[in-house]
Amino acid sequence: MSDLLVQDELVVDKKEIQGSFAPLGMTASEVDAEDEDETPFDKLREECGVMAIHGHPDAARMTYWGLYALQHRGQESAGIASADGQQVNDIKGMGLVSEIFTDDVLEKLPGHIAIGHTRYSTTGDSALLNAQPISVESTRGLIAIAHNGNLINLGTAKERLERDGAIFQTTSDSEIIIQLIAHSAKNTLIDCIADALTQVQGAFSIVMMTRNRIFAARDPHGFRPLAMGRIEGKDGAPDTFCFASETCAFDLLHA
């Protein structure tokens, strides 16, 4: 599992900061192979795009520009969730980023942190319920996730969660991860996330948020890209940190 680094209210993947590294003991084809016992989940392809912003007064708009630059990674649906430390708001829709997020819509997403997702079209059903970010209320508060990748042990993980009382609202494998976090017996949220990621197999990059924190992680072999950028604060303001599936998302943000 990827190491997670906690810094103030920002949680990042330490191995991503250190740079990419070679896969150990697995090939890309093995990671992308489907589990024989897998249920008919809606598969999220590696082309999906994820974006996260931490520490900007207009985080949703910054996330919008990042997703706009990542539009080539997915044209089926897009979504943004933002938070101001007290409340999380999210808006999702079918279509292109620019079609969904007009200026009026972005004004409904206040806050200094945000995550976003743009989804690649699949051969399965195209439905708004599978658009991301996905949010779940848990005993540790609201958690929202945007995920890019392919998990190969969905069937067994889902069956175990359902035996423990989990109720699934989507057919997205991303909900497996967020349910594993919500059902973890660990004491702190960061430990719950680490615990959940040890239980999934495959290739993934993930950005998550609560009402006041951002988390980012990727699979231990680095099969799915996740880059980290920084926007220098002006006039004494703190720096803004951002995460994206590709560094092209940072260009419009001057990161």
Regions inferred by a protein language model and the residue ranges of each:
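Conserved short alpha-helical segments that host acidic/polar catalytic motifs at enzyme active sites
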Residues: 2-255
